[in-house]
Amino acid sequence: MSDQQNTQQDDQPFFNIQRVYLKDMSLEQPNSPGIFLESEAPSVEVQVNVGASQLQEGIFEVVVTGTVTTKVQDKVAFLVEAHQAGIFDIRNVPVEQLDPLLGIACPTILYPYLRGNIADVITRAGFQAIHLSEINFQALYEQRLQAAMEEAQGAEGGNSGIVMPDGSQARH
């Protein structure tokens, strides 16, 4: 193989899953065993967040955090929080494609593991299984971008970027 072919291969976009692991998990049952005697149907609240950090050149950790809180009336039946993580080797990817890769593709890979771990700990705790629904990480990513843009605009004091004839900033 020639040096030119090696260079071309070295410049190709590269994506590899190095490891998927459960970084942290906690279960709290503050009202057990009494909560098991309740007959009312519980309410369930689910929150999912995504974070990413660079560990080394081209090596990233992505963490999907899921929190499930179940209440019967005003009493917490249980609270589960899990951090499902993965280490990804991502090289030669254009900068504008890196953030969507970390915010959409990687969480999509990790989420089934998170769902399984949360469902498992809930049933092992003696509660009826809760199966988390699928998540559209593309939509979640776009919502985060929109919120960040709105926050940035708010930090600028509501300036629209338009300069008025008197030199002041137009407000929106």
From Swiss-Prot:
Could you tell me what this protein is called? Protein-export protein SecB
Organism (species): Cupriavidus necator (strain ATCC 17699 / DSM 428 / KCTC 22496 / NCIMB 10442 / H16 / Stanier 337)
Q: Which gene encodes it?
A: secB
Q: Name one GO biological process term.
A: protein folding
Tell where it localizes. Answer: Cytoplasm
Q: How does it assemble?
A: Homotetramer, a dimer of dimers. One homotetramer interacts with 1 SecA dimer.
Family membership noted in the UniProt record: Belongs to the SecB family.
Do the record's keywords include Protein transport? yes
**InterPro entries hit by this protein:** SecB, SecB-like_sf
The UniProt GO MF terms for this protein read: unfolded protein binding
Stored PANTHER family: PROTEIN-EXPORT PROTEIN SECB, PTHR36918
A Pfam family per the record: SecB
NCBIfam families attached to this UniProt entry? PRK05751.1-5, secB
Coiled-coil residue windows: none
Q: Name one GO cellular component term.
A: cytoplasm
State the source organism's domain of life. Bacteria
Any idea what job this protein has? One of the proteins required for the normal export of preproteins out of the cell cytoplasm. It is a molecular chaperone that binds to a subset of precursor proteins, maintaining them in a translocation-competent state. It also specifically binds to its receptor SecA.
Extract the ranges annotated as region (Disordered): 152-172
Q: Which UniProt keywords apply?
A: Chaperone, Cytoplasm, Protein transport, Translocation, Transport
